[in-house]
């Protein structure tokens, strides 16, 4: 008979953040004798679950998807916006081989470098700072003909806010003594995602043929004319920018075109119009043989160069367990099942070898304040049985209550949710100790600790950017390390299991065995 395993259990209390003020704090207003005792007597620390520490922009609240990806990856997993910000700050962007080759190819052949993208500080589909860096890269590498095709936002930014952005770029080109804004058009045309090809065609013709409904000497003048026609940024009609005596910026064979949007959904259609030989969305008046670069991969079936391919996460916690012939269980309710499986595994849908999964149905209620305990009793029953079974080397469990009930904004319900969790943690702790296992209790982000917005006085239904607790329960004598983050959890678990930490994991163990 096989030896009974002493599992390493990770319990993720979703939306269970740490905040010392009791007011509007469902966690501190709940009766939680079990968690209180664990915090008082067991090794513990606070860890970051938001902002740069999880690969999001500075001070941005965490979320469950990002949280679980970081938990399972054992390294900070940067979102595209932050990844590019970091690359530009550290100047590795300026050495990106795909971008530099594309610029050099055009320069050496006496061809133009065209840059297109959403000129916006919105940071949702693109960021104008990234476009500015691309202009600088092209200029630094000696490109003489640099043409910017500006898509205007007004959707993730105020409806009439493009003027400052356009002026910034016109000033930049003036300072460089080369390059210019060659066209402006609203994102309504250039960034459609619903196969409204008549819109896309207008943006395509504007850039390929240098033909539009309107023409202006400068980008700012073109924008002001659009405002006079009562067009907000998003809806600015195709406008060619060319002063008298300036060369035409129409695209020619051999030119380079770099698309600086990082979000895929609204970048695909216009990219296909440029790249696909068999494109049939509209009859293209001019088909140009371009050296086309996508900033990120917009779709796997678009065959063209990608400056920043998707980061594949090798050796996540789940994969490392499988490689080491360990058994693992993932268990949660419907609401967070994808998080302990797909997201924790770094975006991999298929279970790894030795990975089992248990899904507990979340209750069928309109909103979870009506049943704040959710399915936690059944989840705990199954979790305890799994711990006691001796089958698993490691178990990952998520309790959704703090987050799902926190989102309702109903304080009394959130308190009940937290109290239900305390009862569950008591049973789980006893089960782990009875088999000589180890337990880490943490959260993926905050929520229930802030149930009212202090600024507005309204119910606070969103996540927070506050730290989350991390508690160790087990037989090892350990010392907690300060200053941790979610991506330190996987290395912590491996270290406590006495396993090697793969080199891809840059996180650090937060409990050191003494």
Curated annotation (Swiss-Prot):
The active site is at residue 64. Keywords: Glycolysis, Isomerase, Manganese, Metal-binding. Pathway: Carbohydrate degradation; glycolysis; pyruvate from D-glyceraldehyde 3-phosphate: step 3/5. Its EC number is 5.4.2.12. The keyword Hydrolase does not apply. Binds 2 manganese ions per subunit. GO terms for cellular component: cytosol. One of its GO terms (molecular function) is manganese ion binding. InterPro entries: Alkaline_phosphatase_core_sf (IPR017850), BPG-indep_PGM_N (IPR011258), Metalloenzyme (IPR006124), PGAM_B_sf (IPR036646), Pgm_bpd_ind (IPR005995). It catalyses: (2R)-2-phosphoglycerate = (2R)-3-phosphoglycerate. Monomer. Belongs to the BPG-independent phosphoglycerate mutase family. This is 2,3-bisphosphoglycerate-independent phosphoglycerate mutase. It comes from Salmonella typhi. The gene is gpmI.
